[in-house]
């Protein structure tokens, strides 16, 4: 902290006054000061020089680098001067010099010298604090001492911050207080607050050194306002061209700007400017670690690895920042790495890691060397640690994912996760990254069985990469993309990619040609071109009769219009290749579509035979579970024995599904089967949990309908309605009546649960819509009538204050409609319930419910009439009360206006009386003054004699009291006398008014006395202020 407490504008020739000779002095030329200040100290001691001369000469030695001599002068001053103020300032100056020496020792990494200088600082700073602990200089030095003692310790920084806060509170414009506080805030990462303090310091003194603009630029840089940072540093360079520290920062700006626009034409220009400024700073200060750090990168890019190692050593030796030291070791390791010296490279990387444990690139270097040394286990641990500490490191994730994928026992799940994270980082990265197409294909292969859509995305990226790089695209990649698109339902896109694959297919690859022909036929089949697909299958079978998949697809197409030949062909395929599980699965599906015999189900028999030989065939297990569940649901229960038999069928179905899940834990069809059985047994929570997981795997409306039914049974009506509406919006017109019936049922359950009429109206609406979609369905007709009846009952049962006559009339309409529908359903051929029960329901509604509703309507009419009468009475009473209040307010207003008028007349009368009284008083005073003038003329001689007598008498009294005639009268006494004369004057306020006519004279006298007292108090206050100003002035003179 150069110039912290010393005078920075001292004269070059200092005149030391000689003791006892006021007009003579000794001139000392500061440009030719002796290297030994002992003689100068003797002169100052002999002449008893004031404190400022000791500090001036100490400063002159200090700026010439002779700090020990400066300290010698200040210590001699401590032995000579005895006043506390001088001792405090001299101790503070010595502490400031030791602080600067400690800072230099810290930069040179001389820990012992630094500690010694800091001990000296503490010694002299404590001496200064013992004299004046609240001195701004001492507090500032204590704050700087705390920073140098431990720049990274939070407690030390907090203590230093309290020191600077104290100084700023005591002296709000202290520049060093601003800079110290800003330095601490910057170290804490509070760059905005630090910026404000640096700016306040700059406003206070734009010419201050060190320049606050440097700190302003650093704050702007960390706030990502790099253009503003450049402006601040450029201004520093304009004001002080010799300041090469700023060249480093300006070079850093252009270096960063260049690498933000690597593919831009401005890269070369910005990089050249960066090197120009960095080289200028390096030439002036070749030990600058920041400049060396940037230059080592440039030298490395030129493949001058020896030069890079030398610059890295320079950074390590001259830097006190752990991050810069780690950076130096890292570039040294990279140079050795490129030179093939893996041992030295590993040692350098490890030293970089030891210097800064958060240095990411050194950890990557260690992992790379471990891979080169074939220590894959250690490499895996290293890159796992990197991925945990820095989740945005793309390279670490890629390497770690490849290591897991290429392991002897590959962890595909972890490999997928790591590579997926790496690819997600590519899009968000500001730096351009190149990803090889093989890496995309590898990731697609890892995700193929888990997420088809994601796998297709990676294959598409690989295709885009090859096309953008103008590289050839193989038919295998196009075929794989088409297969995934087919599974995702993107049939037109898959068809187009297969055509492209056939166009680039080499002639000498018949196996791939057969595969593409079959895939193209499958696409034609899905597009509805069954004739084209059938012809394609026939063509394939002509060339390759043993291609079983083509034969199966051909039979499936023929089943749309089956004949005896088709059945024979299916059985022939089964007999010819009964060991093929695909054939057996197809034959089992074929049996499930046939009419089942009551004694034995051929589907169950076929699946059981398959599982005897292939117990892990998942398709057969799921198909067997479906067969058992279908049998249980179709089984009619009339007694407990039959109920137990149906329960056994459900248990068999669950066992089949459970076996399928054991072999394939992610089999969604088996899971859905278990969920359906749980729902049949009213275990809706468990069923919902399973169906929620199955939903993403099976893209089928039936899964959503099952979820909605479970939610409705669990009374989660809002969610159930949302699910059914989603299904309704995505279902074809011919199939919507079932979903509409589900919606009507949910709204009915919700309305009955919450007793809400609007919910039942929604139920009626959806039930009616379902009936409109399928008017011939008697179940839907019954649903409408039932909901209408429930709506009528709910409205009727509501209390009188919660319903209206209109609501009851609407309920009557719904009841009539339901009665009509029930009567109609009795004569339907296949009613949903027995005609007797439906007829009984219609009679009850017609005879009982309708009469109750009619009585309710009559009671509601009477209730509403009574309520209306009460409301009318209340309204009349409110209007009367309002009229009464208005009349009272009007009377009060008139009374107030009359009172104000009377007061105004009285006020005007009193003002006229005061004016007349003033005139009479003025006339009386003029008469008195004329009379007194005559009397004074006559008695002038007499008064003069009396004054002489009083003067002689006052002299006698003053001599008795010890006061001489030459003593001055204090200014305060003189003013007090003036005040006494002013007191005798009578002043009447112009604002004075009489309260009562009868007490006018007495009030006048009280007002005059009060005015005089206030005036006297004001004069005394003014007198005190004057005395205060005089005392301050006298103190400045003394100083």
UniProtKB/Swiss-Prot annotation:
Q: Where is the composition biased (Acidic residues)?
A: 927-936, 992-1006
Output the Gene Ontology terms for molecular function: RNA polymerase II complex binding
Q: Provide the alphabetized UniProt keywords.
A: Coiled coil, Ion transport, Phosphoprotein, Potassium, Potassium transport, Repeat, TPR repeat, Transport
The Basic residues compositionally biased stretches are 940-953
Q: Which GO terms describe its biological process?
A: potassium ion transport; regulation of DNA-templated transcription; transcription elongation by RNA polymerase I; transcription elongation by RNA polymerase II
Using the record for this protein, list the coiled-coil segments as residue ranges, or answer none.
838-929
**GO CC annotations on file:** Cdc73/Paf1 complex; nucleus
Protein name per Swiss-Prot or TrEMBL? Tetratricopeptide repeat protein 1
Name its species: Schizosaccharomyces pombe (strain 972 / ATCC 24843) (Fission yeast)
